[in-house]
Design a protein with these regions (language model features):
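N-terminal/domain-start segments enriched in small and hydrophobic, helix-friendly residues
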Residues: 1, 48, 74
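N-terminal first-folded block
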Residues: 1-35
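A short, structured beta-strand/loop element
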Residues: 31-48
């Protein structure tokens, strides 16, 4: 299982999202100082009712908590878009 697949599986289990996309952007950062550690760069868009009533920082903290130690060991950078289903529907196309 790739890191991106593991991230997707972990987030699906933790948040039961209506929409989830995980992009591995590690290749875009080849030669970057942080890439030397082997940690990957990922972009995640996740839509879940679990984010209702939470501010942006709390949503991000919930995702970090779900990913646990991987945030320190295997993930160097993580760009997040965390939305509720209502926010997702109101989002411009």
């Amino acid at each position: 299982m790739t890191r991106a697949e593991w991230i997707e599986s972990t987030l699906r289990q933790a948040f039961q999202p209506q929409h989830l996309v995980v992009h591995d952007e590690s290749a875009l950062h080849a030669g970057h100082a942080g890439a030397a550690s082997g940690g990957g760069h990922f972009r995640v868009a996740i839509v879940s009712t679990a984010f209702a009533g939470l501010d942006r920082v709390s949503r991000h903290r919930a995702v970090y908590a779900a990913l646990g130690d991987a945030m320190r060991r295997e993930i160097h950078a993580l760009a997040l878009e965390t939305l509720t289903p209502d926010e997702w529907q109101r989002r411009p196309s």
